[in-house]
Amino acid sequence: MSKYKFNIDNYHAIGHADIEIEGITVIVGSNGCGKSTMSRWLYYIVNTLSVLDSFFFSDFRDVIIKSLEKYSNALDDISNYLDDDKKRFFDHTLSLMTMVTLSNGGVEKLDFYYKRAIGSLDDMLVNFLQKEQNPQQVRRVLNLFGITEQNHVHEDIERNSIQLFSEYLQKYEHNKKNRPISYLKEKIAAVYREKDGFPASISFKEDEVELLVDRLGKIYSLNNAIYIGTPAAISLRQSDRVLMTSLAHKVVHVNEKGSEITGKQELLHSINKMIDGSIVEKENFDAVDLVYHSNNGKDIRIEDIASGFKPLVYMLRLIENGWLTENTLLEIDEPETNLHPQWVVELAHLLVRINKTFGTKILITSHNPDMVSAIRYISEKEGLLNTTRFYLAEQSEGTDSFYYKNLGCDIEPVFESFNKSFDTLQKYVENYGEI
């Protein structure tokens, strides 16, 4: 089982955070201490590193397709000279190219479709030149295709296409070999629409090996991070919407690479019992709605259920669809929000069981002493305390920065920090008598 260390320094409210994730990690802190910011960046790093090679390939594929799409306007313009079947064949080939991935044919299949598209262009261009009488229009089209002389159509198209594909392939292979950290930064900004700059001081280690170096390391044992945000939170951040969209996809769709794991059905039964019902799929025209079906026969769409229910429903569907595995990092932000104290303990028990059953690594941010206490003692009961960590975000005196203190398994400082709120309450009572 791999161990991870994640560090951010001097970024927004975070003064220093150096956390370890081996099983379950709990980060405790007040609102505004930067714990959600840290979770978000960990999510970005894991999900970008784990599919970096696929990103390299998709960029290569997309630029090849774009190089062909630029001819579409010209083909539409000269369509009266063209065979409709040939134009449809060209468009269909471009459509097939968009579906090529690193895992289903890669460069070889893309090269095959590219040559097919170029051959189709060659045929259509020859057709056009045989019929077009306007020399200006002929020269205009030849210039677009990079053809020097009308009688050099085949040679020029072949030479130009080979050169173009070779240049883009060389860039793809260069990126794949060198894995520049600048590419990671650009991808995070683009994919997650992250407006804030990349942290100047950030580190991510797998089994003590630093991965965020000039030549990015490969992540071996994690292939997916899943983020469940605070149920009642409303965010205007575009990056938060991207995270929510990714979660929604997994809640709806089955992980084709998932497998049946012993204990899965027991967990699903436990969650159904907790929510006193089940989640069913109901067809809605060409879409599928997820509906909470209570044991007393009431149906509610999951977007309309109580916010405290939602983390439980999300986890139920993630388990059903095979997304929670030993290669998954589950990040859950303040899951206790809007939950009755008894449910907090039940939820903590569920999270510990997920870790034990699937080997899923879990990062929990919280400011609830019941959640912290429940995770601590249930982990011990389940024999998982040696891989459970607790951190407390403490504000540096006279600053807006928070430093994350490693508590190990000693959660007493957490309760001491919560006692400060009671001290504040006592001052109000002393000053005003009643509230």
Predicted segments — roles?
Residues M1-V51, V291-Q426, E430:
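Switch/communication elements of ASCE P-loop NTPase nucleotide-binding domains
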Residues K5-N7, T48-N327, G398-I435:
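Phosphate-coordinating catalytic segments in nucleotide- and nucleic-acid-processing enzymes
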